[in-house]
Amino acid sequence: MSLAAVIVLSPVLLAIALAIRIEDGGPVLYKAQRVGRYGKPVTVYKFRSMRLHADRLEDMLTPEELAEYHKNYKLTSDPRVTKVGALLRKTSLDELPQLFNILMGQLSLVGPRPVLQEETELYGDKRSLLLSCKPGLTGLWQSRGRSNVTYENGRRQEMELRYVRERSLWLDFKILLWTVKAVVRMDGAR
């Protein structure tokens, strides 16, 4: 299924790659280290949506922005995001290269969000439960909450762990439908 999606979406993938390249001339893809199933490291691919060297947080963010980032691993209004990147994020098209992660067997189509090592600590004694499941391109959090649901009040953890506990083919099907709806409506997109 992922191979078919890559083939069908290849004109879109190429157009996005060209837009990124034209905007600032940098690399098209961003490689992010995430934690996969059983805690194994996974390199997740995304279309680059930020300016070059955006990982140098201290150089690019104000102290207030840094505090917000370290609290939620996200910023409400991130000054590092490019114009093309903002559109890609709003439409979730920045995630399309993860189809290659699915082809390589590193991600599943549906599962908990692939997270940073530091984020796994926010799951406390449920960390091993989270990591017992292969991360996915989409999941309960992405389809039902996204940026509107954070770690701060524990709701994001609840959603991700609920998926792991209740996963089934039927739930995956519902999540795929909810994902299409969320992407089309840009629910929780930033």
Residue ranges and their predicted role:
Residues 1-56, 101, 169, 174-190:
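A hydrophobic, helix-centered structural microdomain
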